[in-house]
Amino acid sequence: MPEDHVTATRLGLVATDRGYELPVYPFVAPPELRGDAKRRYPVAIVGGGLTGLTLACDLALRGIPAVLLDDDNSVGVRGAASRGICYAQKSLEIFARLGVYERIAAKGVQWSVGRTFAGDDEVYSFDLQHSRAHDRSCQPAFINLQQFYVEWFLVDRIAELGEVDVRWHSRVERVEQSADAVTLQVATPGGRYALEAQWVIDCSGCHSVLRAQLGVPVHGNRMLDRWCISDVRFRTTPPAERWTWIEAPFNDNRAVWQHRMADGVWRLDYQMAADEESEAIARPEVVRERLARQFGADVDIELVWVGPYAYKSECLERFRAGRVLFAGDAAHVMSPFGARGGNSGIQDADNLGWKLVLVLDGAADPTLLDSYDVERRAAAQDNLRITGRTTRFLSPPTAAERVMRDAVIALAREHGFARGFVNTGRLSAPSTYRDSPLNVSPEGGRAVQNVAFDAAPGGAATLVDLVAEADHAVLCLVDATIADERWQSLQRLAQRHPLRCVRIARDPVEREAVILDRAGRLREQLQLPVGGAALLRPDLYLAGVVPVDDTAIEAALCRMFSGGRG
């Protein structure tokens, strides 16, 4: 680990005049500039942000020697704020499989309670700790943590795994592709070179060079909404809850967000007037005056970082262009309400990693990658619709919508039934892949929570442990009462396909490959009937439930590994 990386870890955060202290990684001349023999890499990832690093870590864990190219030499955005801070349970489950969850949990702030105010009146609240959508997982509903920390932990984990070559100060300038490979032209401080890969994943963000050169249409619009981020430390700490104001009296009746992050820093987002100048709203004296209006003139704070931001919403027409696939902000951009942007990119990577490995291993047809486009583009469009409704609630674009919004707020002040209509952001949740070509029964396409069980093969304690051990194989989970001859038939099937079979029992039994699930939570999550086999994908999505019959299961696997065409 570089010395400046260690120093930055110890310093944590510094004052406003220097912003956040981030690690710096050196440029190392790649083999292509050292005169080594030319090689074709299995995968090249363009962009070392949250999505690119998640995918790189996933591939490293699966033993794929990929290359990651990033045009910067650090994590986060130099000179920028905390950026994305709110990591949802599904993302935390992914990080658990990748081996970085414990660091994130130790550094971040867990929360489950949210409150929304209109003026001084609380008009909506929730506690996700008691929600059935969250209460089965070993991971909490949400953890707040500055984005650069998460990226930092991923870089460390990638280095620890040792399969992926992360190349800093490497800017991709051009892309060309043939029937069997993609060639990237890369500019570095040491010169330019060409890099060839079987597959390229573009995670380079909304200013992607690749998608422009490949001519992939993008649809969207820039919002007029303007905000100012203020990352501050309080000497006296408020509760670790998500508080939002629709009409904050201390912000000229505009919206405000308040979240706690790591290192005792709070993230305050203030909605600004559309005609305010960016430089003016971010001046320290203006920010301090704004904070004094909210917390009182004697508030004792330290400004860590301040900056304005605007946002846009857009989505590519397709997420695959030949051998180039798009993920994260290169594929879709959405407003920040509900923490759906960064979490969506993490889940893009989770969806894509195992599919790439199956294709590279020859166990699946390349058409399997078309399912990434189908599933994740539908998820992006759902997220855009959801965040779009929040945007319209917070900033009604027409007089009629403002009347409706004001009526909802007035009703919510007095009547509980109206509180569910208050919309300051529907929080990130895993998408359901209703129309996925990989679904093999009506139960398919649903995310399964990371439940714990009493005992399992190999010492696995959770479902994430189990899929991690299975690598890119599909899990076939059946009742422990299955007849021995049928079990042996499934084992023979597992020798022909990427499949791992496991039995589920409520009570201890003397059989191999048995999960002891006394509470029945795993069976509940899988909706597993007696005589059924649940097929669980490596990304903890249910492909479906089929009869415990090797012909039916093999047909389902062929359908999955052909991208729905089998």
Describe the residue ranges of each PLM region.
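Active-site-adjacent segment of FAD-dependent monooxygenases/related oxidoreductases
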Residues: T9, G79-R157
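FAD/FMN-dependent oxidoreductases across multiple families
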Residues: Y20-L22, A262, S278-S344, A364, ...
